[in-house]
Amino acid sequence: MQLTDLIVPTAVATPGMRVADVFRECIAKQVPGIPFRDAKGHIAGKASIRHVLKLNCIPDFMVTHGSILGDQIDELTIPAEKARHVINLAIDDFIIPDPAVIGPHSPVAKALAVMERHNTTYLFVIDGDNYLGTISIMGVGAAALSLGES
């Protein structure tokens, strides 16, 4: 199993890009986030669906007490108006700095170790300043399944 065989090419988020465009790219490529390229052209962070939703759609107390919340909290749903507002925001305020990255010639085991170290399920493959794509735990799992069943 080669790391380069697991790369999913994606677009990068850029300053001023709308949340909707980031979500659309992530959903189309089945990745949880994409890298953020700053105005100087450097990968400066990651734009994550989870992070945007966490900051905009769930109050902190729900995160803190999520395991004891009941299932009848309908008044805390995400209304369409809120969704429209969030997806039209610029992604800039939701960038997580220092994303998990790896070089294209690294072994898959190192990719897994980097994911664990960063407590994430995906990372970006970068060769110098050149972004090649994303590798996810799902991609590694699919490759392992395919390899094991062949």
Where in the sequence are the language-model features?
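Bateman/CBS regulatory modules and CBS-like beta-alpha motifs in cytosolic regions of diverse proteins
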Residues: M1-V31, F36-A44, S67-V114, V125-I126, ...
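Charged, low-complexity, helix/coiled-coil-prone segments
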Residues: A13, R50-F61, E81, I87
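Short beta->alpha transition motifs characteristic of CBS
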Residues: V31, I43-D60, N119-F124, Y131-G148
